[in-house]
Design a protein with these regions (language model features):
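N-terminal glycine-rich phosphate/pyrophosphate-binding loop and immediately adjacent elements
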Residues: 1-110, 114-117
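Conserved redox-cofactor binding core of oxidoreductases
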Residues: 107-199
């Protein structure tokens, strides 16, 4: 039996677990990160909608019981189980919660605002501060400029503007500019799929 000793053990390698483990290691703590999922395969099958969305290739075996506000009943939800947790599947959208979202929480948006900024820097978010008409206060410059819209997205954007709406480019934590890492291919399988190139 392995008798290794650690200063800290973090359970789960999703957003929360990986960031906590990173902070502990950077502070000099010997840290073990436990994950029940396997590595995402990142093969051609990971771009197959049937495999990922219908057959649920990475579906976990332990249900989470979720009760939505105002509902009487709990729902069973099965999270994807892979190294990286749902950070592997979320599509890069990096919006901040709004101050009103914290009304029932034991802390306020302002308490978390500096940590949002740290996370945006760490993840290399592309975005344009001030573009979101409902943006919470204190959003500074993103590490990278917002990405150019694809032709279909540009058409939707311009149509929204013509209708008097205020469309904006969603801040994205996807690599479009750091040539030392794989760059986004601009495929159509971001949200809900593991990125095949890990952009």
């Amino acid at each position: 039996m392995n008798s290794a000793h650690y200063d800290a053990v973090v359970v789960g390698s999703g957003f929360g677990g990986s960031l906590v483990a990173r902070a502990l290691v950077r502070a000099g703590f010997k840290t073990a990160l436990l994950e029940r999922g396997q590595w995402a395969r990142r093969d051609d099958v990971d771009w197959d909608q049937s495999e990922i969305l219908i057959k649920q290739r990475y579906r976990g075996t332990s249900p989470l019981l979720i009760k939505q506000y105002g509902s009487r009943d709990f729902q069973r939800v099965y999270a994807n189980e892979v190294v990286g947790g749902n950070s592997v599947f979320y599509g890069g959208a990096s919006l901040r919660l709004r101050p009103a979202d914290f009304a029932r929480w034991p802390f306020a948006y302002g308490d978390l605002a500096p940590y949002y900024t740290q996370a945006e820097q760490l993840m290399g978010v592309h975005g344009e501060a001030g573009a979101d008409p409902h943006e919470p206060p204190g959003v500074g410059a993103y590490p990278h400029d917002a990405i150019e819209l694809s032709a279909p997205a540009r058409r939707i954007y311009e149509t929204g503007q013509a209708l008097g709406l205020q469309p904006f480019k969603i801040p994205l934590a996807i690599n479009f500019s750091d040539a030392t890492r794989p760059l986004c291919l601009r495929c159509i399988t971001c949200d809900g799929f593991p990125c095949k190139v890990e952009a």
